[in-house]
UniProtKB/Swiss-Prot annotation:
Membership in a protein family: Belongs to the bacterial ribosomal protein bS6 family.
Gene Ontology CC entries for this record: cytosolic small ribosomal subunit
Source species of the chain: Polaromonas naphthalenivorans (strain CJ2)
Keyword Ribonucleoprotein part of the UniProt annotation: yes
Role of this protein: Binds together with bS18 to 16S ribosomal RNA.
Residues covered by region (Disordered): 99-121
Gene3D superfamilies in the cross-refs: 3.30.70.60
GO molecular function ontology, one term from the record: structural constituent of ribosome
Annotated InterPro entries: Ribosomal_bS6, Ribosomal_bS6_sf, Ribosomal_S6_plastid/chlpt, Transl_elong_EF1B/ribsomal_bS6
The protein, known as: Small ribosomal subunit protein bS6
Pfam families: Ribosomal_S6
Length: 121
């Protein structure tokens, strides 16, 4: 089995359905004998260019270990899910379990916002 990193861009109107989508994809992976090493919800972020006339999307990053058959099934599910605007799958040499650079940036932004709110109060 190989290690993969999957980045998903979800339609911003479907943000409340992200946990259910994650559970469905995790179920597909574990049913096929794979494992989920890391799931990061990067939140709603600005897109560099418009996709389907949308300026924002909900970003997800999932690191998994799965067989090729499971990956084909998951990518097939991504293609036929209208909420998934884009997806990118990258093969990794080893499992990534620590927080990614993007997640550290998201955490820094959230900490800065809470500090600003405390100073304003």
């Amino acid at each position: 089995m190989r290690h993969y990193e999957i980045v998903l861009l979800i339609h911003p109107d479907q943000s409340e359905q992200v946990p259910a989508m994650l559970e469905r994809y995790k179920g597909m992976i574990t049913a096929g004998g794979g494992t989920v090493h890391r799931v990061e919800d990067w939140g709603r972020r600005q897109l560099v260019y418009l996709i389907q006339k949308l300026a924002k999307a909900h970003y997800l990053c999932i690191n998994i270990e799965a067989s090729q058959a499971v990956m084909e099934e998951i990518e097939h599910a991504f293609k036929f899910n209208d909420a998934v605007l884009r997806h990118l799958t990258v093969v990794k040499k080893k499992a990534e379990t620590g927080p990614s650079l993007m997640m550290r940036n998201v955490e820094r932004e959230e900490a800065r916002k809470t500090q600003q709110q405390e100073f304003a109060a």
